[in-house]
UniProtKB/Swiss-Prot annotation:
GO terms for cellular component: bacterial nucleoid. The keyword Nucleotidyltransferase does not apply. Keywords: DNA damage, DNA recombination, DNA repair. Involved in DNA repair and RecF pathway recombination. Belongs to the RecO family. The gene is recO. InterPro entries: DNA_rep/recomb_RecO_N (IPR022572), NA-bd_OB-fold (IPR012340), RecO (IPR003717), RecO_C (IPR042242). This is DNA repair protein RecO. GO terms for biological process: DNA recombination; double-strand break repair. It comes from Xylella fastidiosa (strain 9a5c). It holds the Pfam family RecO_C.
Length: 243
């Protein structure tokens, strides 16, 4: 299959044999693709190598045969965000999440748009934690494993004042005992779950519980094996708060 003048976001790049690269990209029309960029060493290929960087928005042409395609041409369409600190780690996170959870060639229409929006939010570091929760919700929905965030697992409308455990398969379940502090820590309020369902920015105090709840769901779908970016973010936060 010939792919011509398609736009994509670069997710990951790694060496492939001696002079080539394996480039993972996210497209709206074809989903995630793995492309081999051959012979990219040398001064003449400097512009191409510069375009094949994570977060870069590109236009490319390729020949797709089997699992991996052959990249024929690529050019940068804008300047990729220059990130640092938590915003940079967040970019590693969304890219790693896509690579681990989204199979190649699967349809990703809405997820492509969500990635584009999240990329711009990373550029400004605007509501970073909230942006990541929205992206996580979108990736779960794309995979067909999302759930109704307006009602609990029994179909009862969520109570904003109640805390819920997010069951990876069935969705929100009411926390039965408020006295179990260990379980309470890993729950989300009905208020923040409703906000996530309705794209409404919630109270900042609710975001930590939502982060832990969504991570538990994602960890289930990751087969129990966590992400390298989670470890990097945890180390960064520890270093940032250390005396």
């Amino acid at each position: 299959m010939l792919i011509e003048h398609e736009v994509a976001f670069v997710l990951h790049v790694r060496p492939w044999r001696e002079t080539s690269l394996l480039v993972e990209v996210l497209t709206q029309a074809y989903g995630r693709l793995g492309l081999i960029a051959r012979g990219v060493q040398g001064l003449k290929k400097q512009t191409l190598r510069a375009a094949l960087q994570p977060l870069q928005w590109i236009r490319f042409s390729a020949i797709q045969r089997g699992e991996l395609g052959q990249l024929r041409q690529a050019e940068a369409l804008d300047t990729a965000p220059r990130l640092k600190g938590e915003a940079m780690l967040a970019s590693f996170y969304i890219n790693e999440l896509l690579l681990r959870l989204v199979p190649r060639h699967a349809p990703v229409n809405e997820l492509y748009l969500a990635y584009s929006q999240t990329r711009e939010r990373l550029r400004t570091s605007d509501s970073l934690a909230w942006s990541l929760r929205l992206f996580e919700r979108e990736i779960l929905e794309t995979l067909g494993v999302g759930f109704n965030l307006e009602c609990d697992a029994n179909g009862t409308p969520l109570d904003p004042a109640t805390r819920y455990v997010l069951d990876p398969l069935e969705g929100p379940r009411r926390l039965l005992s408020e006295h179990n502090n260990a379980k309470r820590r890993d729950t989300a309020t009905g208020h923040v779950l409703l906000a996530l369902a309705r794209n409404q920015i919630p109270n900042t105090n609710d975001l930590a519980g939502l982060r832990r709840s969504m991570r538990a769901v994602l960890l289930h779908h990751l087969g129990g094996r966590g992400l390298k970016s989670w470890e990097m973010i945890a180390a960064f936060r520890h270093q940032d708060t250390s005396p």
